[in-house]
Amino acid sequence: MRIGHGYDVHRLVEDRKLIMGGVDIPWEKGLLGHSDADVLLHAIADALLGALAMGDIGKHFPDTDPAFKGADSMKLLEHVVGLIRTQGYAVGNLDATIIAQRPKMAPHIQAMRENVARACGVEVDRINVKATTEEGLGFTGTGEGISAHAVVLLIPQ
């Protein structure tokens, strides 16, 4: 068994879509990034890579590479899952937390879980996604950005 942790953060800006866990969330702002800036999927990909000491998404998908400009983070996650499978591992379970003051994530959590489960090739009962606020504190609390953490347990295939 291997355990990995991932973290990501992006700034909220106008004139961008807000995509979280592969779900397009209606909101007045979106996350700024080289790709679609899906912080949840980025944290999950980092957790998967970290569990096998394979670096992070910046190593595999550098923001200096035009090929990843506007990239769909679901495709990036699917690629990372392929990498862990070539190393003989699969997702045992995954627990992730989105930290955002607004918008409310609860209406979208189940769709996020289903998207992540599909990308990881596992049943949805192995994937947990939850959201919290920081009670108005810090950059997420003031609405400047959104962050996410993920912890994953990989098991031999």
UniProtKB/Swiss-Prot annotation:
4-CDP-2-C-methyl-D-erythritol 2-phosphate binds at residues 8-10, 34-35, 56-58, 61-65, 100-106, 132-135, 139. One of its GO terms (biological process) is isopentenyl diphosphate biosynthetic process, methylerythritol 4-phosphate pathway. Binds 1 divalent metal cation per subunit. It holds the Pfam family YgbB. Its EC number is 4.6.1.12. It is an enzyme of class 4 (lyase). It catalyses: 4-CDP-2-C-methyl-D-erythritol 2-phosphate = 2-C-methyl-D-erythritol 2,4-cyclic diphosphate + CMP. Its cofactor is a divalent metal cation. The record marks H34, T133 as: Transition state stabilizer. Keywords: Isoprene biosynthesis, Lyase, Metal-binding. A divalent metal cation binds at D8, H10, H42. GO terms for molecular function: 2-C-methyl-D-erythritol 2,4-cyclodiphosphate synthase activity; metal ion binding. Pathway: Isoprenoid biosynthesis; isopentenyl diphosphate biosynthesis via DXP pathway; isopentenyl diphosphate from 1-deoxy-D-xylulose 5-phosphate: step 4/6. Involved in the biosynthesis of isopentenyl diphosphate (IPP) and dimethylallyl diphosphate (DMAPP), two major building blocks of isoprenoid compounds. Catalyzes the conversion of 4-diphosphocytidyl-2-C-methyl-D-erythritol 2-phosphate (CDP-ME2P) to 2-C-methyl-D-erythritol 2,4-cyclodiphosphate (ME-CPP) with a corresponding release of cytidine 5-monophosphate (CMP). PANTHER family: 2-C-METHYL-D-ERYTHRITOL 2,4-CYCLODIPHOSPHATE SYNTHASE, CHLOROPLASTIC. Homotrimer. Belongs to the IspF family. This is 2-C-methyl-D-erythritol 2,4-cyclodiphosphate synthase.
